[in-house]
Amino acid sequence: MSGLTHFDAAGHAHMVDVGGKQETQRVAVARGTIRMLPATFALIRDGKAKKGDVLGVARIAAIQGAKRTADLIPLCHPLALTRVAVDFELDDALPGVHCVAQVETFGRTGVEMEALTAVQVGLLTVYDMCKAVDRGMVITDVSVREKRGGKSGDWTAEDAAG
């Protein structure tokens, strides 16, 4: 892996010039988890949270988060996303909820940051909608799981782990 790309020779932050890169299909998948009390999990699972459909609202928030990534992360390029898909998986064993976001574009730079932002915003929305009953929820294990396209090629977390 090469050096940090967001700094020039003098050490000043700058937005990377992607003008000379080829446009290709870019895909990134990110995942994260929010752990909670069993009673909080039951409220979400049973659709009985006072604020409404927790996972439905969190899905919309995650999609919006992906779309607004360049507004939140200073050196991210604004991208025309072609797809944002967000899924939630209830996990009785934690108890908690896993969020998986897949983001796609046809462009000159990857969408890893958009996928990560989608997951974080989705999980933050779950926290916001349930914090009245459980302030101890923990957002954890947010990571890129897969990346496809671009000059550096395809990558998966499983392959990287060996």
UniProtKB/Swiss-Prot annotation:
Alphabetized GO MF terms: cyclic pyranopterin monophosphate synthase activity
Active site: 128
Known catalytic reactions: (8S)-3',8-cyclo-7,8-dihydroguanosine 5'-triphosphate = cyclic pyranopterin phosphate + diphosphate
EC number: 4.6.1.17
Any Pfam family matching the protein: MoaC
Root EC class: lyase
Residues noted as binding substrate in the record, renumbered to the chain: 75-77, 113-114
InterPro entries reported for this sequence: MoaC, MoaC_bact/euk, MoaC_sf, MoCo_biosynth_MoaA/MoaC, Mopterin_CF_biosynth-C_dom
Pathway: Cofactor biosynthesis; molybdopterin biosynthesis
Keywords: Lyase, Molybdenum cofactor biosynthesis
Gene Ontology biological process terms in this record: Mo-molybdopterin cofactor biosynthetic process
Lyase is among the record's keywords: yes
Family named by the database record: Belongs to the MoaC family.
Subunit structure: Homohexamer; trimer of dimers.
Function of the protein: Catalyzes the conversion of (8S)-3',8-cyclo-7,8-dihydroguanosine 5'-triphosphate to cyclic pyranopterin monophosphate (cPMP).
Protein name: Cyclic pyranopterin monophosphate synthase
Top-level taxonomy: Bacteria, Pseudomonadati, Pseudomonadota, Betaproteobacteria, Burkholderiales
